Each structure stands twice: as structure tokens, then as C-alpha cells.
Amino acid sequence: MRKKIIFVCQDCLSRNYVKRWTKQPLQRLIINKYCKQCNQKTKHLDSF
């Protein structure tokens, strides 16, 4: 079964991106993505 991982902006805490993975990663994922609320590229952390 695939797990749903939601990425949350580190600055404004808005939930912007969703990803589905078959396995849960061992470490926390940090991805540099564009945030609509901040209007810039920020770090996004995963939240299970």
C-alpha cells in the first residue's frame, strides 16, 4: 500500500505538495520547492 506524504513549508507551515511512496523513508525529507503563500522557494519538510 502506498503512503501519502505531505510536504509543509518551513516558513509559513502551509501544505503545498503531496507525494505517494511505497516505502516510508528512513530520514525526514527536505525538499526545496516553491511556496505560493511565501512567493519564493523555501524548504519543505515531510509530514506523515
From Swiss-Prot:
CC annotations in GO: cytoplasm; ribonucleoprotein complex; ribosome
Q: What superkingdom heads the lineage? A: Bacteria
Ion transport: present as a keyword of the record?
no
The record ties this protein, via Pfam families, to:
Ribosomal_L33
Q: Which GO terms describe its molecular function?
A: structural constituent of ribosome
Keyword Kinase assigned? no
Q: What is this protein called?
A: Large ribosomal subunit protein bL33B
**Species name for this entry?**
Mycoplasma genitalium (strain ATCC 33530 / DSM 19775 / NCTC 10195 / G37) (Mycoplasmoides genitalium)
